[in-house]
C-alpha cells in the first residue's frame, strides 16, 4: 500500500471516529454491493460537511464490477469517489484487505447464481479488513477492529459497508488472507460433514474436487476425527498434496471411474458423499452410500464447462438431475441432503455457532486455510481462470492493491 493511500486511510478513520454513529444513512442489504456512480449530478450540491475535509484529497476507491453476464471480461475494474464512511444503524464500514473467490462468483458471472443482486453489481461473498466506522447500535465493533465478513455480495472493493451481524472478529494470529479464505469454504465443509453428515470415528467420506477450497477445508476437518477414511477426486498432478493432507485414496477422475475404484476398495461404499457437482454425479454418490449413509449436495459445478455459459452443459446437468422418492429412501436407509450457505444469511445464531467452533479449531492449530494464489484486482480475470480451469490447490484470493497485505 502506498504512503499516500495509508495517509488517506488514517485520515478517513480519524474522521469517522469523530463523526461516530451520527453519520449513518440506513442503507439496505443490497446497498454495499452497488457501487455508486461517478457522474456529477446536474443539480447544485450542498457544501461538504466538515468531516468530509479529512478525506477530500483521498484517491478514488477501486471496485470490481460485473457489468454483464458472460466471460472473464465482464468483470471490470472501476473507481468511485472516496467519501467519509456513513454506515447506517446496525452496519459498519471496513477497508478490505483481502477477499475470497468462490465457485458461486464464477456462476454469478455467467448468470447462473440466483442470489446475486441485479447488475451492475460488485461480486464477492467474503473478505477481511479493518473497521473504519460503525453505525448506530453497533456496540461490539469499533474502528480499528480486524474482521472477516460473510456477505451476499459486494466484497470485491476497497471499502464496503455491511451489516455488523455478518462480521466476525479475527483471531490475533490470523492474517487477512487466511481470514478471507476461511468463512465460505470452512462453514460449508463443517456443516456438510458434521451437521448433515454426522461424521464420526471410523466413517468413510468421498470428497469431490478435493484440492479446491472446500475440499482442502474438508480434509483438514476430517483429520479432527479419528480413523476417517477419505476418498478424494482430483487430477493426478495433485495427488501427492492430497496424500499429505489426509486423503487415504486419491482418485484421478480424468482417467478412472471413481465409482468402480471406490467399490474395489470399499465394496459396501462410503458413509458420506460431499457432492459439489450435481447432475449425474449426485445419483452416483447416492448409489455409493452404505446403509445410514448420506449424500450432501452443495453445488452445481458441472454447469461450468468454460468461461461462458454452455447451454448443452446446462441441459445435460438438469436432465440428469437426481430424484428419489421417500419410499426409496426408507427402503435403502439412506439420506439425501442439500446445503446452500447463501440461503442461511438470516440464520445468524446458527452461522455464528459454526464460526465460533472454526475459530477454536484454528486457534488450536487443527485447521489453517491453504492459500493457492493471491491476485491484485487488476488481474481478476487471471484469478477466475485459475479457479475455473481447476488449476488451484486451495483458495484463490483477490487483494485491492498490487502487493499482498497482511
From Swiss-Prot:
Similarity remark: Belongs to the zinc-containing alcohol dehydrogenase family. Quinone oxidoreductase subfamily.
One Pfam family linked to the record: ADH_N
Positions where Phosphoserine occurs in the chain: 2, 33, 42
Protein's UniProt keywords contain Oxidoreductase: yes
Enzyme superclass (EC): oxidoreductase
Compartmental location: Cytoplasm; Mitochondrion outer membrane
Gene label: Vat1
Region (Disordered): 1-57
Low complexity composition bias: residue spans: 9-22
GO cellular component: mitochondrial outer membrane
Organism: Mus musculus
Keywords assigned: Acetylation, Cytoplasm, Membrane, Mitochondrion, Mitochondrion outer membrane, Oxidoreductase, Phosphoprotein
Modified residues (N-acetylserine): 2
The protein's name: Synaptic vesicle membrane protein VAT-1 homolog
Transmembrane segments: none
EC numbers, comma separated: 1.-.-.-
MF term (GO), any: zinc ion binding
